[in-house]
Amino acid sequence: MAAQIPQSNEVRVGKKPVMNYVLATLTLLNQGVDRIEIKARGRAISKAVDTVEIVRNRFLPGQVRVAEIRIGSQTVTSADGRQSRISTIDIVLERVK
């Protein structure tokens, strides 16, 4: 699968520390974005949840809410040809009006 370019309202969570993703989310919100999608796969799912909770409870309490949570899985083919499934999560944060 070819890597896709993230959209301007998207934060993709990976191996970096949680605070990097919190800062990216806060930066997007400060730029005026009203809906942000935080996406993660596999082991990074817990980091995505931590990111959302830190933004909601520590930095912007009462100012953002979780609008939607989507879970799923993707089939990935390894270098030796085996297929495996990887869990995914998309959390949509939106500004409270």
Curated annotation (Swiss-Prot):
InterPro entries, A to Z: Alba-like_dom_sf, DNA/RNA-bd_Alba, DNA/RNA-bd_Alba-like
Keyword Acetylation carried by entry: yes
Keyword set, alphabetical order: Acetylation, Chromosome, Cytoplasm, DNA condensation, DNA-binding
Bilayer-spanning residue ranges: none
Matching Pfam families: Alba
One of the record's GO molecular function terms: RNA binding
Main location: cytoplasm
GO biological process terms held by the UniProt record: chromosome condensation
Role of this protein: Binds double-stranded DNA tightly but without sequence specificity. Involved in DNA compaction.
Family designation: Belongs to the histone-like Alba family.
Name the record gives this protein: DNA/RNA-binding protein Alba
Organism: Ignicoccus hospitalis (strain KIN4/I / DSM 18386 / JCM 14125)
Gene: albA
